[in-house]
Regions:
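A polyanion-binding, active-site-adjacent surface
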Residues: 1-166
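Active-site flanking residues adjacent to catalytic metal/cofactor-binding acidic residues
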Residues: 18-19, 71, 110, 201, ...
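Acidic beta-strand-to-loop metal/phosphate-binding motif
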Residues: 66-73, 200, 257-267, 549-551
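Phosphate- and divalent-cation-binding pockets in alpha/beta enzyme and binding domains
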Residues: 78-79, 267-273, 425, 561
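Active-site-proximal helix-loop-helix substrate-binding element of RNase H-like nuclease domains
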Residues: 104-107, 113-116, 122-146, 153-156, ...
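Conserved "right-hand" nucleotidyltransferase catalytic core of DNA-directed polymerases
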Residues: 161-235, 296, 308-309, 313-316, ...
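Detector for conserved single-position "signature" residues within domains
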Residues: 565-566
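Short, amphipathic alpha-helical "recognition" segments used to contact nucleic acids or chromatin
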Residues: 641-653
Length: 655
C-alpha cells in the first residue's frame, strides 16, 4: 500500500520527501513520537496542506511546488541538487537551500525518527555514538559534526526555514565585489579611511601559524578584499616594505573600528603573537554571541550559515596548504566567502540576541576576549629547573610503582596502562566482581573495588595511574616569555581560554596552536589546560618580579546556584551561615566515622540535631568541620569528604 500523503486542503507549496519509512511507519508516514514532533514543529494546521512522500516509492512533485524538504540520507542522495565535482552529504548540505533545475528550492535535514531516537535504532548495527565533534580550533570554522542530541533542534530550525521559503521565496543573495589579490595601495587606503564601523575580518594560516591570506570588509562597503600574504612557494606576495605598511594599516583599522570575527580568539592571537598587532578594544565574536543565545547547540561557522543564511555550503572548499596556483585561488575564494557569510551572520545575530534576551550576556563575553587573550600571551612563569626535576621524579616514581606491581602480581610484563591486562588480572585471575563492565579499569571503578576488597595491588595500580597522569600532563611545550627581548626564554605555562567552551558558560582552556595536521611540534602545541591543575602542579607557578600570585575561586558555586534556584530552606541557610554543603552532608552520612576519631563522640549526635544557624555557633563545630575536611587525604576507602562531595553533586544534578 502506498504511504504517500497528498494535501487534503489547499496546497501550500511544500513537499516533504522522507528517505525511508521508519520502523513505526507500517500504515502511514510519520507515525509515533517522531510524527508528533514533526507535526508540532510544522504546526498541525499546516500538515494538511503539504505533500508528504517517501523516496522508496515513486515521487511526484506537484504543480506549484516551491520547496522540497528532504529528510534523511537516502532522500538527500537521490534528490538534492549537487554541484559538479562537489559531492554532498547530509551533514554538509543540511539547512543550506539549493535551487534545482526545475526552479524548485531543495533543502535537507535529519529524518524525524533519527532526530527523535537517542541512538541509531534504524540501522542494523545500531551505533551508540553521539557524534560529538572535538572542540578544537579547526572545527569551529567548518560545518563540523552535529551531536545527535541536537538533531531535533536543527530539524526544527530547518522545518521553519523550509516553510518560510515556501511562503516568501528565496531572496536574491546580496551582491559583493570580492577582490582577490588587490592592489596593495588600494587596500592600505581602504583600511585607513573608516572610523567607528564594523570591520569583518578572517585570516587563513599555515600549520606554523603564519598568514596565508587576510580577508576583510567594512560594514558600509560591498567590497571584500582578500589580501594574499604568502604564495604556495612560501614567498611573500608583496615586497617586505609593502607588507609592513599593510600590517600597520590593519593595526590602525582594528583600533578605530569594531572587529567582527568568528572564533576571534584564534585570529587575534595569531595576529598579536606573530605580527605584533595589538589586541583591539572593540571585538564582536559571532561564535560567542551565538553561544550566548543557544549554549548547547553547535557553533561552527557552517552551522550558523545554515541557520541565518540561504547560501550553499562552501566550508568543504578550503585548501589550507595549497601546492599550486589553482589551489591558491581556491583558498582565496573560500576566504572571501567566509567574510561575506560572517557579515550576514553578524546582522542576523543582532536580532537573535534581542529575541533571546542575551544582549548583555553576549556583550560581557565579547569584553572578556581581550583580557583572556592577554593572559594567554603573558602565560604564567614557572621555575624550569623545578619543572624538569618534578617531571623526572614523577617518572621515577611511576617506574618504581610498576616494578612493585610486577612483583606483587607475579607478572613481570604487567603493563598498568593496558586496560586489557588490568581487566584480565583483576576479573579473570583474581575473580573479582566488576562494578562497572563499561569502565572496568577507570579510577572510580577501582576505588569501588577497594571499598569491599583489601587488595594491595589495586592501590598500587591507582597510584601508578595517578602518577602517570601527572607526568603526562607535564609533557608540554613551555611558552616564550614575551615580556623580554630574548627569543629562547621558554619558561611559562600558557593556555587558550575558551569562553564558549562549555554549555554552562564555565570557562574552558586547552593548549594553543595545536593541530591534527602538521609536524610533531604542531601536534603538541604550547601549554595545556590550566583550569584543572592539581595542587602539586600549581606549586610550580611563580610570580613575575614585583607581582604576587593570587587564587580566586567561588567555592561550591554549583551548589550555591541550586540553593537559590530552590525555595528558601535549610540548603540555602547553609550558604547564608558559611557552612559548606559537603561538610553538612558528610557530618550526617558518616557520623559513626567521626565518633571514632574525636575526643567527645557525643557532640557529633548533638551537631546532627542542629539547624545551620545553630550549628555554626556550636563550640565543637569547628573541630568536627576540620576533621571532615581532613578526611579528603585519608585512604581511598575512608575519603568521606570526597564521597559527601559526590553525593552533593549527584543531588544537584538530579542523578
Amino acid at each position: 500500500m502506498p504511504l504517500a500523503q497528498l494535501p487534503t486542503i489547499d496546497y501550500c507549496g511544500l513537499t516533504i520527501i522522507l528517505g525511508k519509512p521508519s520502523r513505526f511507519d507500517t500504515h502511514k508516514l510519520l507515525s509515533g513520537h517522531a510524527g508528533y514532533l514533526f507535526t508540532k514543529y510544522l504546526h498541525p494546521a499546516i500538515v494538511e496542506s503539504i505533500s508528504l512522500q517517501v523516496a522508496t516509492e515513486p515521487v511526484t512533485i506537484l504543480p506549484n511546488t516551491k520547496v522540497v524538504l528532504l529528510l534523511g540520507d537516502e532522500a538527500v542522495a537521490k534528490y538534492y541538487p549537487i554541484e559538479e565535482g562537489k559531492p554532498t552529504t547530509l551533514n554538509d548540505a543540511r539547512g543550506n537551500p539549493a535551487m534545482g533545475k526545475d526552479g524548485v528550492i531543495y533543502i535537507c535535514s535529519y529524518a524525524p525518527q533519527d532526530a527523535a531516537d537517542v541512538k541509531d535504532y534504524e540501522s542494523p548495527e545500531g551505533d551508540d555514538d553521539d557524534g560529538e565533534d572535538s572542540d578544537d580550533s579547526s572545527s569551529v570554522k567548518s560545518h563540523g559534526v552535529t551531536k545527535r542530541r541536537n538533531w531535533k533542534w536543527w530539524l526544527k530550525a530547518d522545518i521553519k526555514k523550509a516553510f518560510y521559503l515556501a511562503k516568501h521565496g528565496m531572496a536574491p543573495e546580496e551582491d559583493f565585489n570580492i577582490k582577490l589579490y588587490p592592489e596593495i595601495d588600494e587596500v592600505i587606503n581602504t583600511l585607513l579611511t573608516p572610523h567607528g564601523e564594523y570591520l569583518y575580518l578572517d585570516i587563513e594560516t599555515s600549520a606554523q601559524q603564519t598568514l596565508t591570506c587576510v580577508g576583510f570588509n567594512f560594514s558600509d562597503s560591498k567590497n571584500v578584499y582578500v589580501v594574499p600574504w604568502k604564495t604556495y612557494q612560501n614567498t611573500l606576495t608583496y615586497s617586505d616594505n609593502l607588507c609592513r605598511k599593510f600590517i600597520q594599516a590593519l593595526t590602525v583599522a582594528m583600533g578605530r573600528n569594531t572587529v567582527v570575527c568568528h572564533n576571534a580568539a584564534f585570529d587575534l592571537l595569531v595576529l598579536a603573537y606573530k605580527y605584533k598587532i595589538p589586541l583591539p578594544r572593540k571585538v564582536e565574536d559571532t561564535m560567542l554571541m551565538w553561544h550566548r543565545c543557544y549554549p548547547e547547540v553547535e557553533k561552527s561557522l557552517g552551522h550558523l550559515i545554515s541557520y541565518f543564511l540561504n547560501r550553499r555550503y562552501h566550508k568543504g572548499e578550503g585548501i589550507y596548504s595549497p601546492h599550486n596556483a589553482t589551489q591558491e585561488l581556491q583558498l582565496y575564494t573560500y576566504n572571501g566567502k567566509d567574510i561575506v557569510t560572517t557579515r550576514g551572520i553578524h546582522i542576523g545575530l543582532k536580532a537573535e540576541l534581542v529575541k533571546t534576551g542575551a544582549e548583555k550576556s553576549a556583550d560581557w563575553a565579547n569584553r572578556m576576549l581581550r583580557p583572556y587573550l592577554t593572559a594567554t600571551l603573558r602565560g604564567i612563569k614557572t621555575d624550569v629547573a623545578a619543572f624538569c626535576k618534578r617531571y623526572d621524579n614523577l617518572e621515577a616514581k611511576r617506574l618504581a610503582l610498576n616494578r612493585c606491581i610486577a612483583i606483587i602480581t607475579s607478572r613481570p610484563d604487567m603493563n598498568v596502562r593496558s586496560w586489557q591486562q588490568v581487566t584480565k588480572y583483576l576479573y579473570a585471575e583474581q575473580k573479582l566482581p566488576c562494578p562497572d563492565p563499561k569502565n572496568p579499569t577507570n579510577s572510580k571503578t577501582l576505588l569501588r573495588l577497594l571499598t569491599k576488597h583489601k587488595i594491595p595491588s589495586i592501590k598500587l595500580i591507582l597510584m601508578s595511574k595517578r602518577t602517570g597522569k601527572l607526568s603526562s600532563s607535564m609533557k608540554i611545550r613551555l611558552w616564550m616569555d614575551l615580556t623580554t627581548k630574548s627569543t629562547d626564554n621558554f619558561n611559562r605555562w600558557t593556555c587558550g581560554y575558551n569562553i564558549a567552551g562549555t554549555d554552562s558558560f564555565r570557562l574552558g582552556s586547552r593548549a594553543i596552536f595545536k593541530y591534527k595536521r602538521g609536524d610533531a611540534e604542531g601536534k603538541i602545541g604550547y601549554g595545556t589546560n590550566l583550569q584543572n591543575q592539581k595542587k602539586e602542579q600549581r606549586t610550580l607557578f611563580v610570580s613575575d618580579t614585583g607581582l604576587k600570585l593570587g587564587q580566586v575561586d567561588q567555592a561550591g558555586a554549583e551548589a550555591l546556584i541550586v540553593a537559590y534556584l530552590c525555595r528558601h530552606g535549610r540548603f540555602r541557610d547553609l550558604f547564608l551561615n558559611g557552612i559548606k554543603s559537603h561538610v553538612f552532608v558528610g557530618l550526617h552520612v558518616f557520623k559513626d566515622a567521626w565518633k571514632k576519631r574525636i575526643d567527645n563522640p557525643d557532640c557529633v549526635d548533638a551537631l546532627c540535631d542542629l539547624n545551620p544557624r545553630e550549628l555554626k555557633l556550636h563550640p565543637d563545630f569547628k573541630k568536627v568541620e576540620r576533621l571532615i575536611k581532613d578526611s579528603d587525604a585519608w585512604p581511598a576507602a575512608e575519603r568521606y569528604y570526597f564521597i559527601a562531595k559526590m553525593i552533593c553533586h549527584a543531588s544537584n544534578y538530579g542523578m
